[in-house]
Amino acid sequence: MAASRRSQHHHHHHQQQLQPAPGASAPPPPPPPPLSPGLAPGPTPASPTAGGLAPFASPRHGLALPEGDGSRDPPDRPRSPDPVDGAVCTVAAPAAVPAASAAVGVAPTPAGGGGGGGNNSASSASSPTSSSSSSPSSPGSSLAESPEAAGVGSTATLGAGAAGLGPGVPAVSGALRELLEACRNGDVSRVKRLVDAANVNAKDMAGRKSSPLHFAAGFGRKDVVEHLLQMGANVHARDDGGLIPLHNACSFGHAEVVSLLLCQGADPNARDNWNYTPLHEAAIKGKIDVCIVLLQHGADPNIRNTDGKSALDLADPSAKAVLTGEYKKDELLEAARSGNEEKLMALLTPLNVNCHASDGRKSTPLHLAAGYNRVRIVQLLLQHGADVHAKDKGGLVPLHNACSYGHYEVTELLLKHGACVNAMDLWQFTPLHEAASKNRVEVCSLLLSHGADPTLVNCHGKSAVDMAPTPELRERLTYEFKGHSLLQAAREADLAKVKKTLALEIINFKQPQSHETALHCAVASLHPKRKQVAELLLRKGANVNEKNKDFMTPLHVAAERAHNDVMEVLHKHGAKMNALDSLGQTALHRAALAGHLQTCRLLLSYGSDPSIISLQGFTAAQMGNEAVQQILSESTPMRTSDVDYRLLEASKAGDLETVKQLCSPQNVNCRDLEGRHSTPLHFAAGYNRVSVVEYLLHHGADVHAKDKGGLVPLHNACSYGHYEVAELLVRHGASVNVADLWKFTPLHEAAAKGKYEICKLLLKHGADPTKKNRDGNTPLDLVKEGDTDIQDLLRGDAALLDAAKKGCLARVQKLCTPENINCRDTQGRNSTPLHLAAGYNNLEVAEYLLEHGADVNAQDKGGLIPLHNAASYGHVDIAALLIKYNTCVNATDKWAFTPLHEAAQKGRTQLCALLLAHGADPTMKNQEGQTPLDLATADDIRALLIDAMPPEALPTCFKPQATVVSASLISPASTPSCLSAASSIDNLTGPLTDLAVGGASNAGDGAAGAERKEGEVAGLDMNISQFLKSLGLEHLRDIFETEQITLDVLADMGHEELKEIGINAYGHRHKLIKGVERLLGGQQGTNPYLTFHCVNQGTILLDLAPEDKEYQSVEEEMQSTIREHRDGGNAGGIFNRYNVIRIQKVVNKKLRERFCHRQKEVSEENHNHHNERMLFHGSPFINAIIHKGFDERHAYIGGMFGAGIYFAENSSKSNQYVYGIGGGTGCPTHKDRSCYICHRQMLFCRVTLGKSFLQFSTMKMAHAPPGHHSVIGRPSVNGLAYAEYVIYRGEQAYPEYLITYQIMKPEAPSQTATAAEQKT
């Protein structure tokens, strides 16, 4: 594929000449340089180079997209930071600078060249002036290494603004020009004098529309940058290329300025017009310090530019290590080990925070810091995303290290950040094993308090208790484990578990850190059975007045949480109503502070003293709100007042005006004490009074308030399907998973009542569809039969997977979201919906999933991608669709099976053809060392695979052999040339003459053309041992050697003679007799076991000499038909010339006769006109073609014009198919479609077109249209860019020339410019 280029308009570059220093006269512009030979102006190129194929630097890099690619309009100026903007800077010594634009990144464009458009139209030709533009300092870069290197001298001044800018370009005012120059030069005192709020963000309208901050940042003027920022400079300001000041600072490596801009809010992921981020700029230039600073401030290294390149793809070799996390990795690890905070923070980035050491235990920084008790380092690493679950070579996590060495604080930190307390290494040792075996008593207690299980055994069958070195520790481990188990059961208010774990010795067990007892945990529990658990604990002897570390009794805890049901139990068992905590507060203080009116009333009724003053000097009333103060001042039990009653009724009726009159902070959460203890919000939510609900929520209504049955207002709204109310409540913080006394959640209510939209709302906000009510039913269990939409909704991922499997597109469309499109079948093979759609041949579903972002290369449990499924079951259309979405055709599963292995093993012929046409590698082996050919079950698939495999990869019995003859060894008379002395393509299309090779050996005449002497096999070049091996009968060699039977003796033997010498198997005798007959008759290729090759019936390849006119004509045709294609170099690579290594003429008598016969038929059917053309053909099956000719089985029905054999008049088009359709997966060695190393092969063929059918749009055909012999696809606006030629019978083409070549990497723009100057 020819190199892609984006055409540019250069008129601004012509106008914006460099201005002389003040006081100097402007030199006249130099005349345009003369054109190089072969680069004459005009639309018709004089050579391939002149044809627009020279490397052309885009505004961003050396290989631009073609014009009209739709991504954006071509810019008027090359894209580069302001320090090198030639529109605003001039040089004091004009003689040293060419009169062309000083902007960086503009590559020379040959006259008449330019990038081809989307429809291959020629772009506007650049002026000669643009040919001498300065180029980037390195290929692929639009930025010079330094401002001075870009052609801006240290004494440069800003241009006059008007002079030389041409009409229509605004001039820069003198004051602004002076400010910009001061920013550029770093003259901070001058900047302070000139800058003000009005011009701090002024734009350089004569240049790149840059701000003063762009200039100061690009030139690294830190003091100026600081002052500009203080004056209000906009760090987000963009120039006309979309660059912000941070881009400039990063491109030129000013790390301090970069840090300053980032601290002032500059976006580290800002993208310019070509989607380049500051990290792209720094990486391209190898600015390591800047890369580190950017990554530390959140730069995303995965962002890709318009060309699909990430910062890593474009990075200078020196910066690649930073982007892979390998930069100074050893120093980072040492800093973590030694506790060197400064060094660590200088190197630490999100990309290396979890790096592993290259040797030793493969530890991460967190492993080392944890093991060496570097608490501050551990904190920093965790704050910066260190993985607490990372494993070293032995499977140890950082928690293992900390526990093994008894580092309590580090252990606490790791647990706080989610470390798995029961993580196991390769020997199944947990952190508790490590701590217990080393007698780390306090660490053991800490681990147990976080759920460590001392009963887990390692690979030796030993538990942590078994490994404890002392009886005291063993006893402590057992005791604390039981105690923590009881605490956990109490937290969950699990009555059965509490009964099971409860024992007298642990009834008052205290959590080591918080000193909470099981009773504290029970009264704090949110579960409905807390009251029963508390009663059980108290009956078994729990201390009702036990205090935790804050001196809070269970009553304090219950009062603070308004768990009024438990308070009744505590009161009954003698809880002290006026017990004081560490702040001198009673339970009444706690309830008052939390605003729990009912709790305060209850405590007062139990005898709490409202007059007690805390250590801070407050009574309970003084700590409460107005409603609490009123209650405590009255100190009498309340009943529903008339005002409260009227408020409740107004809320129920939706009387907003009355609600507004009666509602106050004191009664907004009043209760219906004679009923269910509902609040006004309960009533308004249940009766769908939206306006009342909204008013109550804005005036302090409690969304968590529970009635007598444990229902919150959200239960009411969901039960009755009031969507707006439910949405309001959720928005104001209502819990979607709250359960009533019967463990019904709002989702239970909505599901049971068939409220689809409510269910959807709740699930969207995190409702748990697996929660069970008291009867053990989930919301799904309560859905009525027939409510399939709700069932699907509640089944979640399972429903989407089922719909994909069954091919129900409507269900898939309804259920699919960006979050679940790649969900997994966790109960099965871990398949995605796309796996199932592909395996069950649900094309519409697969297409929908792919359009909406499904991962085309997602692997299931066995490592299979969707293409494996489609290939295994023979779903051709699905496979073609997956390939269209760039699936990996050579993906391997866990057993190294590729999709081609699957298709070959299952006998899927069409799929094998499709995969091979798109670059599937037939030589890949699975774990058993088998290629697809080894697994093939059908003969046609074997043939396909043999044709696609390179000769060196084929088994001996399948290897085709061609005789290679140097043309210099054959006299011209014996090999008539199809070419005249003139090297024109017209001379290549003459009649096909008989190319029999005389003199050398009459290879084209066949064995029958020569008399065989008695007892001699003519033309034979093998012994009996080779012959037997070729037939797979090596085991008979001993018999033949004993009987001294040679091939000429064998030729006269029949069944009886063979039987007499001991060959009893009829099959063996038959194979021997037929093999000799074919050997004598030269019938190659009919027996797959026959390995010998008779040169007189096979293919001869004549090596043409480079000085041969025929060689030169073919090469010239090949070089001159390189075109620019719309794929931007994606399929055939980026190049502008071939390196032709070898051209061989293909001579095969059988194929030639077949071609001539078909040509005669076509001519008779088309009024004696066979319409022959010389055309190019690229294919993975070239080796098979030169031996067997073109085969329709290689055709792909999904081609633009159906299952035909495609040819092109442009070599660059055929080059796109050398490795498969669309370039396949690239060369076999490097998997690179643009590989400049590997050799490629292409055919230059004689093609009999006969009567052609002109077609402008896609048409799927298996045969030529009636009355026609071929199809010509003509270029059109939205169709082909160049003509394609299609035949549907293989014998209509003959492979005349086999061309071996390489594509050549385009030269750097600077080299091209230098070469052009030298030629001039």
Swiss-Prot record:
Poly-ADP-ribosyltransferase involved in various processes such as Wnt signaling pathway, telomere length and vesicle trafficking. Acts as an activator of the Wnt signaling pathway by mediating poly-ADP-ribosylation (PARsylation) of AXIN1 and AXIN2, 2 key components of the beta-catenin destruction complex: poly-ADP-ribosylated target proteins are recognized by RNF146, which mediates their ubiquitination and subsequent degradation. Also mediates PARsylation of BLZF1 and CASC3, followed by recruitment of RNF146 and subsequent ubiquitination. Keywords: ADP-ribosylation, ANK repeat, Cell cycle, Cell division, Chromosome, Cytoplasm, Cytoskeleton, Glycosyltransferase, Golgi apparatus, Membrane, Metal-binding, Mitosis, mRNA transport, NAD, Nuclear pore complex, Nucleotidyltransferase, Nucleus, Phosphoprotein, Protein transport, Repeat, Telomere, Transferase, Translocation, Transport, Ubl conjugation, Wnt signaling pathway, Zinc. Zn(2+) binds at residues 1227, 1230, 1235, 1238. Residues 25-46 have a biased composition (Pro residues). InterPro entries: Ankyrin_rpt, Ankyrin_rpt-contain_sf, Poly(ADP-ribose)pol_cat_dom, SAM, SAM/pointed_sf. It comes from the Eukaryota. Its EC number is 2.4.2.30, 2.4.2.-. PANTHER family: ANKYRIN REPEAT DOMAIN-CONTAINING PROTEIN 39-RELATED (PTHR24171). Phosphorylated on serine residues by MAPK kinases upon insulin stimulation. Phosphorylated during mitosis. Ubiquitinated by RNF146 when auto-poly-ADP-ribosylated, leading to its degradation. The gene is Tnks. The lineage of its organism: Eukaryota, Metazoa, Chordata, Craniata, Vertebrata. Belongs to the ARTD/PARP family. It comes from Mus musculus (Mouse). GO terms for biological process: cell division; mRNA transport; negative regulation of maintenance of mitotic sister chromatid cohesion, telomeric; negative regulation of telomere maintenance via telomere lengthening; positive regulation of canonical Wnt signaling pathway; positive regulation of telomere capping; positive regulation of telomere maintenance via telomerase; positive regulation of transcription by RNA polymerase II. ANK repeats lie at residues 174-202, 208-237, 241-270, 274-303, 361-390, 394-423, 427-456, 514-546, 550-579, 583-612, 676-705, 709-738, 742-771, 775-803, 829-858, 862-891, 895-924, 928-957. This is Poly [ADP-ribose] polymerase tankyrase-1. GO terms for cellular component: centrosome; chromosome, telomeric region; cytosol; Golgi apparatus; Golgi membrane; mitotic spindle pole; nuclear body; nuclear membrane. Residues 69-82 have a biased composition (Basic and acidic residues). Oligomerizes and associates with TNKS2. Interacts with the cytoplasmic domain of LNPEP/Otase in SLC2A4/GLUT4-vesicles. Binds to the N-terminus of telomeric TERF1 via the ANK repeats. Found in a complex with POT1; TERF1 and TINF2. Interacts with AXIN1. Interacts with AXIN2. Interacts with BLZF1 and CASC3. Interacts with NUMA1. Residues 1019-1082 form the SAM domain. Residues 1105-1310 form the PARP catalytic domain.
